[in-house]
Structures are given as structure tokens and as C-alpha cells.
Amino acid sequence: MINVQDATKRAKDHLREFFPEADEVQLEEVELTPDKAYWLVTLSYAGVSNSVASSLLVGKSLRYKIFKLDAESGEVISMKVRDFK
């Protein structure tokens, strides 16, 4: 079984592979599922706003991704957008 540090590193590596422009990557949440089968890792990163007006007003906005990793092998099973509403 991989440990929490390894799960976090693998999630960060996966994020950077698909979003090389991701800046200021931070760990937000990490959880081992009750059955100990998966690690759920939530990362945030600074993203440039899509609109010029928003960029001028707020600059960078935080984006969130949640990763599901197989706790035994460390394989990334999924990456999803995490919205806070």
C-alpha cells in the first residue's frame, strides 16, 4: 500500500503532466476511503482567469482537482474538477 506522501506526490505529478501551466500547487484534502482501497487527494492551483475583465480585477483564481488513486498500486484512477459552491 502506498502512503499519504506518495499518494500526494503522484497526484501532483499527474496534475503537472496534464496542466504544465499549473502554478502554486497546494494540497487541500487527502482521505483514505473506509475500505482502504483508494486515496482521494484534492489539490488546488492558481489559474489565470479566462476573461480580460476578471484578470484585471482578481488576477489568478484557484482551481481544484480531486484525484482518486488505487491505494495498493498508486495508479491514478480518475481526476475530476472539484467545485465549491
Regions flagged by a language model, labelled:
Residues 1-85:
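Long, terminal "pre-/pro-" and other extracytoplasmic accessory regions
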